[in-house]
Amino acid sequence: AQTVRXDIPHHEXY
């Protein structure tokens, strides 16, 4: 994710 939200972490690698 390009924006750090509460739902999604900053790392999209996983």
Curated annotation (Swiss-Prot):
Signal peptide: none annotated. It is found in: Secreted. Expressed by the venom gland. Keywords: Neurotoxin, Secreted, Toxin. The keyword DNA damage does not apply. GO terms for cellular component: extracellular region. One of its GO terms (molecular function) is toxin activity. The keyword Calcium does not apply. It comes from the Eukaryota. Belongs to the scolopendra toxin 5 family. This is Scolopendra 5928.03 Da toxin.
